[in-house]
Every structure is written in C-alpha cells, then in structure tokens.
C-alpha cells in the first residue's frame, strides 16, 4: 500500500510539473525574446518588441522598446513607404542598436493615439496594421490551443508566399473543416515578409462570438469622428499600407452640431462609407490587410455534360443580396453572401473528392482504360465546379463594385448640390459654405481613393494589366482633380466669403495634395505610351494656395457690391471655366473648350469635367495652343489624302464605264445582212466577223499609209 501511494504521489508530481511547464511556456518564450532584445540593444531591459506603423499623410510611428509607447519619426520627415524592402531599411534606421533581419506584418490591428500630420498640430487616433521588426534569428510565435480547438501546420519548401497569402490559405483550410481561424503564425522565412509555411489554430464558430460582441461594444463607445475612422478602416486592408487620410476636421464637426437646427436637412449627412472591392474581396475581421487571393480560373476546355452536384447549403444570403438594392449595410450583406458562396463551394468540392475516392476504391479491378475514363470524368467535374465558383464570385464582386460606385456617385452629387445651394443662399454664410465644401471634397476624395486602391491592387496582382489601365486611372484622377478645382472656382462669385475662409481652403487642399503626390510618385516609375502620357509625365503640379480673389480695401464696403446671387441652373456665362456635361474621355481636349460654359445641376457629377488651368488664378499657358495646331495639321493632311484617293477612284470608275459602253456599241449588229448561199464557210465566217466590227489589220494599215 505504501508503495502504491508513493507511486501515485510521484505521478501526481510529474503531472503538476508538466502542467506548470505548459502554462509557462508561452510566457517564457515571450520573456526570452524580450531579454534577447535587451541584450541586443544594450540599453536596458526591453518591455516591447520593435514595431513601426504608417499612415499616408502623417509621420511614421515606432514603438519605444523601453517604454512600450508609440513615438513619431525622429527626423520629422518620413511618411508611408512604398515596398517591404523600404520598411526593412526603415526598421534598421529606427532601431540601429538592434540587429533587424526581417519584417513581418502583424496579425491584428492596433489603435495609435495622438498621431499628427507633418508640420501640423492636429492629432487624432488611427487604427492600422503595424509591421514587426524581427531581431536576429527568426522565432515563430507560440500559439495557444483552447478547448475544442485544433492545431495545424503547413510547410512547403518549394513555395515562398507572403504573409497575407498564408493567412488566406489557413482561413480557407479552417472553413474546409467547418471551423474558423483563431490564431496563426509564420514558419521558415524565405524573404522580406515571405515564408515557407505557417501554423494555425482552428476553433468552432461559437468561440468567436464573445470577441465579436466585445469589439461591437467598443465601437459603439467611440465618438462620431472615430466612427468615421472605423468605417474607413475597411479600406485599410491593402497588401501594403496605402491608407489615405479621410479624417474630418474636429472644428467643423463641432460647428455642425451647433448649426444643425438652423440648417435642417439641406446638407445631407455624409456618412464616411467606403468599401474597396478590390482589396476587400477576401477581407474578414481577423486580418483587415488580406488581399484578393483568387483570380479568374483559366480553363481552356470544360466538359459540358458533367453534372455538378446540388448545393448542400441554402443560398438565402446570396439570393437576398442580389434581390435587394444597396443600402448602408451593403458591405455586411456582401461579406455574408461571399462567405456563403465559399462555404457552398467547399462543400461541393468535399463531396466530389469523397465520391472520387470511393470510385477509385471500387475501380481497382477495372481495366486501365475505364479507370482513365473515370479519372477524366472527375477531373472535368472539379474544373466545372471551380469555373462555376469563379463565375459566381466574379458576379458577386462586380455587383458589389457597381453598387459601391453608385453610392459614391450619389453622395458626391448630393454634396455638390448642397455646396451650390450654400453658394446661392441669400445672404451666403461663410461657415456653411466651408462646411458644404469640406463634405464635397471629402466625397471626391472617396472616389479618388477608390481608384487608387483599385490600381494598387491590380499592380500587385497583375502588373501587365496595371500598365494597360494606368492611362485610364490617371485620366480619372485628373478628372476628379479638375472637377474639385472647378467647384472651388465657384467661390469667385462671392469673393469676400472666399477671403474669409481662405486659410481653411488652403489647408484642405494641401492635405489632399499630400496624399495625391504620394500616389503619383509611387507609379511614376512605370510610364505608359498612350495619348495622355504627356499629361501623366507632368503629373500634378506643385501645390499653390488658391488665391483667385483680388485684395480688398478695408475702407470699402465690399459685401453689397461684390455679392451677386447665383441663379440656380444658370450660372457662369461671364465666368471663365464652368461645369459642362461630357464624358471623362474628352479630358485630353480640355484646353480646347469654350470659355463660356453653363452650370447644370441636373448633370451627373461623374460626367462633369472642368478647366483647372484658371482655377488657381494662374494665367493660361501659351503651350496649350500647341496641341490644337498639331491636331489641325494632322486633320488637314488626312483630308488631303482622302481627297486624292477619292479622285483616283472616280477616275478609274469613269474609265471603266467608258470602256464598257464602247464595247457594248461595238457588238451591235445593224440591220439584216443577206448571206450568199454560194459562199464558203470561211467567207461566211469572215462576213460575220466584219458585221460585228472586225477589220483586217493589213487593210487598215494600208489605208493609214495612203492617208
């Protein structure tokens, strides 16, 4: 009995030791990494791992490993970077005392407070995905496996994929098992933010309910401005940080609350909604930076008589999405429909694979030709399923894209109408005009950001296609730029109001210009030989504050004299430049337009183009005449060539008609010719030939000689 008790006590002690080791393993690993950081730095005990964060238009942030707090760029100049290699170099510059060997995108976003713009005092908090600066030899993350969860890992030495790609694969792997992704980590680095494998934990879907409810409660507690940031957070999921600054001004927000009762509903509330369908195709709450990982499946031949197994799950979410129109819940309904399609496709594939395995087991004793036919049948079935899934997903994404573009256009149109209404009010109120202008510029920026994100996604996935669409992207960006500048030029109708809000306008334009310069500089390395390449090479001119208004004397009573209410729908026949209805493709002929133009508020905002050369008070450049002369010269040369060709064709036709008519007259036989029955057949034939116009060339020659 004593021996038995001793053995039981020993077993219990071993179990407790193993339990303690299991509980302390993650903490020990993290502590070891922190101690390694401190030893590497030589500056004291580190409390945080080195990380950097970027937000375009604002200074880069990095973690102070001694304090654990986020600090701005020490040089005060560095903003968002362009490549992962630049991120690695920046990590090495920020942490020179550490041996930074690689970078890796973090799995979860962070909220950084007091994030300021360059040379600005305005600071706000933003939610971004930071980059981890990896020190020394790579150490994989320690993953916890909760109850009822499963641990998996994948290693492919022949594959070197990015962080986002591995995340997509593990998420799909969990969905295949009927689970959801709980956590994951990278294995075996093979490049900058590239790895040979990953390890991950999948849990039942009920495990994520608590975390989702916690996140929703936290979002409800945010202020109005922060809610705008959260909604724009759906945008911050590009393959590389290209977040544009969509923050609203805090002063304007406060003023809006003060004047809500006066303005009523004339200025429509501009909810900061935006969804990027090109980056958000594979987006989920676990990793907002996940890119689209599924392209169009290229199958040359599909067997059409293959019967696709029926859908095991209902398609209510998909049907509801297509049957209902767009609303404020567009993004949520799109996500639900997309997830439903993925689950349905996975179940179909699992069913086909299971049937394939069963058929192979039963076909072991069959001849080789029959087994080959069976294999081809299932291969065709798999291809048909993949093609159908790709088609359904493409239809879903295209529908969502069209709805998002329509929503952006509607909000931009409403913002422009409110801005025009504010200008036409009697008397005009400067603050209300500024507020409406900010909303309009914000709506234009949504469209610009939508276009930029689309191009950046295509550039990362298909550079060849990006090169083909670059001219279209730049044209659309120029259209947005000119449309916005022309709207600003409408302030010329009320110069005293424009002078009062001049500083706010300059600041607003400079903020938008900073983001635009960042994008144009990133794509200027890949020129495209198209018609608009001359405009693209110039890109966007450096920022000049908008001062189209003459200085006014303080002694003059300018308000009654300078104020001329704009008649709604008529507008600016005397004003240089105006709003006209046109397609965006005529942007290349913008310098040839008439100066007397009319505002028509019924026009779709997307179809308006403007003459931006006179918006900033700049004189029209004489070089603008050059393209007109060149086009005229080319048109004249083409016209002359067409005339020459037409004359030649007409000459050939006339000659042909004359020859044909001459031949017809030559074959006419005049009257009845009596034939001598005594003539020989040769003589009869000669007479017949002479009757039809035949002349003996010898006789004809002799006659000509006598003449």
From Swiss-Prot:
**Residue ranges, Extracellular compartment?**
32-636
- The annotated region (CuBD subdomain) lies at 147-205
- Which residue positions does Phosphoserine occur at? 216, 534
Q: Which domain of life is it from?
A: Eukaryota
InterPro entries in the cross-refs? Amyloid_Cu-bd_sf, Amyloid_glyco, Amyloid_glyco_Cu-bd, Amyloid_glyco_E2_domain, Amyloid_glyco_extra, Amyloid_glyco_heparin-bd, Amyloid_glyco_heparin-bd_sf, Amyloid_glyco_intracell_CS
UniProt-annotated location(s): Cell membrane; Nucleus
- Write out the biased-composition intervals (Basic and acidic residues): 270-282
The UniProt annotation puts the region (Disordered) at: 208-298, 539-575
Q: Which stretches are tagged as biased composition: Acidic residues?
A: 218-234, 242-269
Q: Which residues are glycosylated?
A: 485, 570
> What SMART domains does the database record attribute to this sequence?
A4_EXTRA
Q: Where does Cu cation bind?
A: 163, 167, 184
Tell me the segments the record calls region GFLD subdomain: 46-139
Does the entry annotate any disulfide bonds, and if so which pairs? 56-80, 91-133, 116-123, 149-203, 160-190, 174-202
Key words of the record: Cell membrane, Copper, Disulfide bond, DNA-binding, Glycoprotein, Membrane, Metal-binding, Nucleus, Phosphoprotein, Proteoglycan, Signal, Transmembrane, Transmembrane helix
Q: Where is this region: Interaction with DAB2?
A: 693-707
- The chain positions of domain E2 read 317-508
**What Gene Ontology terms describe what this protein does at the molecular function level?**
DNA binding; heparin binding; transition metal ion binding
- Site, as annotated: Required for Cu(2+) reduction: 186
The reply on keyword Disulfide bond is yes
Question: Could you tell me the membrane topology recorded for this protein?
Answer: Single-pass type I membrane protein
State the similarity comment.
Belongs to the APP family.
- Subunit organization: Interacts with CPEB1. Interacts (via NPXY motif) with DAB2 (via PID domain); the interaction is impaired by tyrosine phosphorylation of the NPXY motif. Interacts (via cytoplasmic domain) with APBB2/FE65L. Interacts (via intracellular domain) with APBB3/FE65L2.
Please describe what this protein does: May play a role in the regulation of hemostasis. The soluble form may have inhibitory properties towards coagulation factors. May interact with cellular G-protein signaling pathways. May bind to the DNA 5'-GTCACATG-3'(CDEI box). Inhibits trypsin, chymotrypsin, plasmin, factor XIA and plasma and glandular kallikrein. Modulates the Cu/Zn nitric oxide-catalyzed autodegradation of GPC1 heparan sulfate side chains in fibroblasts.
Name of the molecule in the record: Amyloid beta precursor like protein 2
Question: Could you read off the lineage of the organism from its UniProt record?
Answer: Eukaryota, Metazoa, Chordata, Craniata, Vertebrata
């Amino acid at each position: 009995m004593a021996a038995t008790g001793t053995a039981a006590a020993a077993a219990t002690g071993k179990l407790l030791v193993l339990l303690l080791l299991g509980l302390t393993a993650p903490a020990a690993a993290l502590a070891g990494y922190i101690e390694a950081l401190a030893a590497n730095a030589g500056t004291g005990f580190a409390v945080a791992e080195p990380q950097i964060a970027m937000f375009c238009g604002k200074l880069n942030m990095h973690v102070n490993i001694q304090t654990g707090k986020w600090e701005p760029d020490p040089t005060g100049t560095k903003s968002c970077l362009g490549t992962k290699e630049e991120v690695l170099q920046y990590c090495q510059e920020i942490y020179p005392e550490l041996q930074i060997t690689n970078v890796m995108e973090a799995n979860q976003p962070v909220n950084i407070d007091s994030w300021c713009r360059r040379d600005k005092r305005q600071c706000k908090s933003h939610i971004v995905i930071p980059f981890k600066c990896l020190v020394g030899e790579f150490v994989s993350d320690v993953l916890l496996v909760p109850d009822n969860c499963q641990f998996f890992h994948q290693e492919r030495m022949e594959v070197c994929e990015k962080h986002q790609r591995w995340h997509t694969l593990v998420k799909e792997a969990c969905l295949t098992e009927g689970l959801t992704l709980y956590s994951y980590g990278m294995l075996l680095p093979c490049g900058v933010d590239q790895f040979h494998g990953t390890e991950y934990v999948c849990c039942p879907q009920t495990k994520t309910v608590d975390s989702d409810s916690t996140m929703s409660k936290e979002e409800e507690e945010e202020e109005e401005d922060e809610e705008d940031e959260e909604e724009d957070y759906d945008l911050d999921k590009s393959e590389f940080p290209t977040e544009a600054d969509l923050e609203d001004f805090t002063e304007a927000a406060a003023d809006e609350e003060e004047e809500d009762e006066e303005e009523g509903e004339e200025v429509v509330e501009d909810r900061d909604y935006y969804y990027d369908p090109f980056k958000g195709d594979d987006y989920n709450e676990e990793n907002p930076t996940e890119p689209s990982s599924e392209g169009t499946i290229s199958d040359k031949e599909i067997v059409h008589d293959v019967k696709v197994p029926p859908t095991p799950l209902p398609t209510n979410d998909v049907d509801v999405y297509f049957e209902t129109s767009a609303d404020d819940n567009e993004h949520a309904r799109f996500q639900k429909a997309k997830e439903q399609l993925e689950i349905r496709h996975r179940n179909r594939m699992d069913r086909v694979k299971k049937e394939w395995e069963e058929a192979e087991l039963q076909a072991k004793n069959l001849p080789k030709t029959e087994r080959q036919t069976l294999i081809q049948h299932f291969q065709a079935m798999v291809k048909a399923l993949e093609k159908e899934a790709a088609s359904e997903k493409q239809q879903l994404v295209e529908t969502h894209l069209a709805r998002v573009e329509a929503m952006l256009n509607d909000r931009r149109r409403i913002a422009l109408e409110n801005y025009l209404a504010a200008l036409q009010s009697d008397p005009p109120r400067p603050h209300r005009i500024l507020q409406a202008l900010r909303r309009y510029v914000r709506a234009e920026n949504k469209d610009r950001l939508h276009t930029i994100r689309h191009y950046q996604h295509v550039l990362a996935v298909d550079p060849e296609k990006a090169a083909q669409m670059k001219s279209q992207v730049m044209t659309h960006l120029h259209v947005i730029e000119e449309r916005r500048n022309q709207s600003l030029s409408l302030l010329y109708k009320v110069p005293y109001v424009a002078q009062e809000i001049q500083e706010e306008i300059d600041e607003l334009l400079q903020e938008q210009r900073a983001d635009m310069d960042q994008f144009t500089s990133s794509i200027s390395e890949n020129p495209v030989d198209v018609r608009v390449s001359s405009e693209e090479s110039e890109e966007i001119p450096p920022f000049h504050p908008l001062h189209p208004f003459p200085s006014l004397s303080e002694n003059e009573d300018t308000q009654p004299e300078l104020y001329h209410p704009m008649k709604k729908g008529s507008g600016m026949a005397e004003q240089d430049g105006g709003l006209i209805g046109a397609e965006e493709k005529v942007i290349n002929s913008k310098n040839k337009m008439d100066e007397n133009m009319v505002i028509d508020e019924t026009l779709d905002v997307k179809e308006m183009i403007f003459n931006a050369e006179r918006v900033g008070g700049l004189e029209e450049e004489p070089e603008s005449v050059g393209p007109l002369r060149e086009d005229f010269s080319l048109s004249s040369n083409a016209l002359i060539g067409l005339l020459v060709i037409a004359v030649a064709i007409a000459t050939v036709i006339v000659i042909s008609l004359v020859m044909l008519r001459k031949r017809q007259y030559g074959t006419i036989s005049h009257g009845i010719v009596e034939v001598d029955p005594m003539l020989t057949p040769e003589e009869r034939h000669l007479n017949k030939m002479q009757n039809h116009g035949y002349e003996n060339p010898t006789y004809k020659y002799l006659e000509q000689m006598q003449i």
